[in-house]
UniProtKB/Swiss-Prot annotation:
Known function: Catalyzes the attachment of alanine to tRNA(Ala) in a two-step reaction: alanine is first activated by ATP to form Ala-AMP and then transferred to the acceptor end of tRNA(Ala). Also edits incorrectly charged Ser-tRNA(Ala) and Gly-tRNA(Ala) via its editing domain.
Organism name: Wolinella succinogenes (strain ATCC 29543 / DSM 1740 / CCUG 13145 / JCM 31913 / LMG 7466 / NCTC 11488 / FDC 602W)
Name assigned to this protein: Alanine--tRNA ligase
Annotated family: Belongs to the class-II aminoacyl-tRNA synthetase family.
Required cofactor(s): Zn(2+)
UniProt domain comment: Consists of three domains; the N-terminal catalytic domain, the editing domain and the C-terminal C-Ala domain. The editing domain removes incorrectly charged amino acids, while the C-Ala domain, along with tRNA(Ala), serves as a bridge to cooperatively bring together the editing and aminoacylation centers thus stimulating deacylation of misacylated tRNAs.
Gene behind this protein: alaS
GO terms (BP aspect): alanyl-tRNA aminoacylation; negative regulation of DNA-templated transcription
Amino acid sequence: MDIRKLFLDYFASKGHAVYESMPLVPDDPTLLFTNAGMVQFKDIFTGKVPAPTNPRATSCQLCIRAGGKHNDLENVGYTSRHHTLFEMLGNFSFGDYFKEQAIDHAWEFVTEVLGFSKEVLWVTVHESDDEAFELWQKHVDASRIKRMGDKDNFWQMGDTGACGPCSEIFVDQGEEKFHGSEDYFGGDGDRFLEIWNLVFMQYERSSDGTLTPLPKPSIDTGMGLERVAALKEGKSSNFDSSLFMPMIRKVEELTGKPYHYESGASYRVIADHIRSICFLLAQGVNFDKEGRGYVLRRILRRAVRHGYLLGLNAPFLHEVAEVVCGQMGDHYGYLKEKREHIKRLTFQEEERFFATIAGGMEVFKKELEKTQSVFSGEAAFKLYDTFGFPLDLTEDMLREKGIRVDLAAFEACMKEQRARAKASWKGSGDELKEGDFALLLEAFPSNSFVGYEKEAHTSKLLAILNRDYKRVSSLGAGESGFVMLEETPFYAESGGQCGDEGELRARGRIVAQVQGTKKYFGLNLSRIEALDEICEGETLEAVVSRERLEVQKHHSATHLLHAILRQKLGDHVAQAGSLVEKDRLRFDFSHPKALTHEEVGMVEEEVNRLISLSIPSRTREMRVDEAKASGAMALFGEKYGDLVRVVDFGEASVELCGGTHVENSAHIGSFYITKESGVSAGVRRIEAVCGMAAYHYGKEALQEIAEAKEILKAKELKLGIEKLKEQVRELKSEMSALSSSKSGAISEGVMMGETRVIVETLEAGDIKNSIDEIKNRYEKVAVLLLQVKEEKVMLAAGVKGEDRIKAGAWIKEIAPILGGGGGGRDDFAQAGGKDASKADEALQSAKNYALERLA
């Protein structure tokens, strides 16, 4: 039974538009991941955007709850129905049908399409919702309808805003399976399982708690696919269903051990976590030290650790990923397209963690032996800081033994990192909460952008904010703030393209310089510095800076670059971020390794070839589904409306894009890659210049070459460099010979058994080279040399073929005598000191140290 298809087809037959699952990374700074089906319709429910033409919608939404407010990670594997990734089936009405039809649809689908017996179905409603109680009685006997309080049956998005009562449908799994004291309807047991939540959004809650009926109430429902699938297959646990057993069977194959539910938590963790790993990697999230990438890393490391418990001591998750891509790739086609990319990045991250997990587990076991009930916070921090064990992974390991971590001590160790993290968020938007944006949104729901067609436009000045985002009626000369034009030609920063700069003109002169443009809560606002008084309500001429053309050149170049990277490196390449400015571009993309010098050159040449073909650009507006069907590249993480702009340069590049572009590829001029580097695991970065910036880059490069030739006194730079390299080689050879002669002059020391001990002052030469020369001369030797240069002291020690003396420990013992410090490996160490007057004392102590250990 394909429940996903049955659900979408059913609601399509009821006049609902079918929406694709939105990206797991939402265009919403308040959310870490998409965690509910209604997220992609949030702006409609809150009134920020108007309802679509068809006010009925349905979707099967991928959701992740692992990190942030909604975090199920620690429960996964230990319960029958917690998951990091799940699919939420939902139907939505935006001011169209309400309770009666929502209830009728739900009942019909559950009983007639899914085939659940009416005898096993129960319903809850809010204690005050008499209307829902009456409507349900058309389908269910009143004895099977239970009234519940706000905690269970009232839904709200936040402290204020849209909210309303909800109604839930439950399935009775049978008394014969579940018969604990909590297994009654409304209890905390597992006998009665909720499968569908119908939210009746009918109120607006004000700041004082007052509920005001909405003029057009809406419907938001959610049904967990995994839970319904398990019930339809007669399974008590989601993990026993056909959605998870293929991954569990693969783990059985890899371990050679059979899965049993009672002891199979590790199998369930792996089966769950690999789904999240596959989808996040496919959608452009990469392993990282912070943010979403860190959550992904935690998920993988938790799965690896559970594999380690099962005896898997080498990378294995990439093999389980193959199963996920095969099983779910028919509905989510990009899993098959990105299969090799997913497996490669998973394998690489596993390798990194397996390199440290054994050492970390050793530290964990030793600390555990000393632990009664509380695990050392310092040890937990060491596991985190040195071995890459996230705190929740350590807690997970201890949970099985009934032990907790000393969180206070752990937090004390983390204090410095937390302070740095807090500092990095400074200015990230908290000050905006104090601004007057609510007043602007109430007075002017939006302002329109007209800059695609024109770069100068006369418009009314609707509102002014000062630099603290407070609304004011005017700004005087020298004051800075923000302006909202009724129609603006200034492009607001978006999609990596910087916001437009320019001028505001009135009364025959320039009255303000526009220094940038951004969207704030959907409003296009330009940051300005006033040169003369400007007032709300007056008419201004807005003129975009000519530098926008240079920005457009760089933006169009990123499209061509993206296309060439996919063509030359593979379809796994996906945009992971970009920055487009007037004098440079930066393009981040998914790729597992650094580009070779030849690959960089090839990419640069191919982009320039497309530029030289003088390909006209074309911009079209079309429905998002039509655009994707036509082959236009859509980027994960981007939020698209019903209508989208498609920008193409012939067949070379076709992308969904809201930015501004050149009219012809030839207008880009030329394209030079200035740098290729890594951003994080699996993400590379190309920096480049084009247009006038490319001209200046080339001119400066030629100037540097001319200056270098002048310095080298060479007509050809390459010949001059080769000559210089030869001179350097000769000088190094002379220095090495000199160093060897000096080290040869050092005494042969004393023999202690079979080991030669040399402790001497080095008058001249390189101290490290001298140590190496002496070590090469003898089979067993412990040597420490001291050298004084300009009142500073250098110490170096080397040990070969002798375990009783460690060079690092030797140096640490002697360096303090000279007022310094240092250290190193067992075979070589060095240090510096400040007090040259103690040189003789230090040498004597060094001799005594060696002789005592070899006696």
